[in-house]
Amino acid sequence: MVKIMAPITPTTSPQVKGLLSRFLTAPDRHPKLRYVYDISLIAISILCIVSIILWTQGSGLALFAIAPALAIGALGVTLLVSDLAESPKSKEVADTVAAVSLPFILTGTAAGLMFSAIAVGGGAVILANPLFLMGSMTLGFALMSLHKVTYQYLSNRSQWQKQNKIKQIESAAWENKLPKESKESSLQTSVRYSSLARKDKTRRNKPGMPNKGSQVPASIANTERSLRSEEVLHSQSLLRQKELFPNTSNIKKELPNTKSILHTPLNRRSPSGSDSDDVYYTPRAGLSSAETSALGDISGISSSSTSSKTSTPKAKRRVVRSSRSERNARHHRNKEDHRQNQEESSDDEDSSPLPSPRRKKYRSRPK
């Protein structure tokens, strides 16, 4: 069983409504009251410090209560700076005021503590007075704040001003250049597209330029037509052979000897000295017309009448090319056979015994 969970309703925390909560949340409801609260904290801390010094007259353990008063004053200063730093201009003003006034405030408090210690009692007792010790510590903090806060802020402020000037110049230049660049880019794109469109139009208008999409189907159709025409021619040649020679077994037996009948090389050399390896003749005088036609059909050469009836001009060219390639292949084979025969005959002549020199002399004598 699937358990259906009920939707969980968010629980709201109970709002505390009281005088203290309203007093603390007043700056959130009224932003201008923030400055009043910050200044009041600073004033309270100053009043506490002055009242402690006057009440103790520079002696006693009550002087250590100045430390929380100083902390409250520092908190008021930081809150005032953060409230003033809402806009960039107010932030710059608040940062400069805090950086410059902090060392002076610390030196003033240190001087007040030291003078109060001196007023209570002089001599070596001053070094044991807690007011004097606290004054010396605050003086050290003032020097540290002068180096770490004021000097660094002033040095960084010059860099920030330079960076802001550079950014303003870049933004102004970019805003001025934006319309020009947009116009130039639009012109360039329009020119490019217009040139491409013109090229496409010229290509389409040309009669001899086929489209790229129609090239592949045309080539496929041509190859299919050529294959069909070759199949038709081959079947017709076989039918014609059967009509002319019903006894095809005798023809098949005589086929191996057709090489020697068709192409017989001339072993004798011409008197001019040129090699006769490339000279061949086809003695068909002893063959009948039926045999020659059969041999022509076997070699792949079809008659013009049958090809003209059943084949297209492209198929005719295809058949003529195939017959030429077959002739070239046979010619090459006959050349190789003739060379092998010559090599065998030369080997036989080398292996035969040489005639005696007497017989040679006898033969060379004139009768």
UniProtKB/Swiss-Prot annotation:
Protein topology in the membrane: Multi-pass membrane protein
UniProt key word Cell membrane: yes
Membrane-crossing residue ranges in chain numbering: 35-55, 61-81, 92-112, 113-133
Residue ranges, compositional bias (Polar residues): 257-274
Protein origin, superkingdom: Bacteria
GO cellular component annotations of the record: plasma membrane
Residue numbers spanned by region Disordered: 177-220, 249-283, 296-367
This protein's UniProt keywords: Cell membrane, Membrane, Transmembrane, Transmembrane helix
InterPro entries named in the record: DUF5423
Biased composition (Basic and acidic residues): 323-342
Family assignment from sequence similarity: Belongs to the chlamydial CPn_0443/CT_005/TC_0273 family.
Record-given protein name: Uncharacterized protein TC_0273
Organism: Chlamydia muridarum (strain MoPn / Nigg)
